[in-house]
């Protein structure tokens, strides 16, 4: 299976929601995550649905869902590589490392506090 980031970027652009991040900033986070996923697993990230792309884009600027949807980001896109690196360095049982896992629950919040505080 080959992951086509250009096609992913086109789909993302077509469904991109209002966000404190630009499309390019969000795509840079996705690209970094997908590169680390391939490095970690040895295979490309599986495709994700447009609805999942929208949810991730909506959540990305905010550490906690409680405060999501505002005009100002809680976390800058430039902070994501450190969080993603820490995520892949953490051992999880029965985890496929899909980006949906990274953006679920409080995982990013915990990595944020571990890495940046």
Predicted regions and their residues:
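Append "and, occasionally, other polyanion-binding protein interfaces
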Residues: 2-117
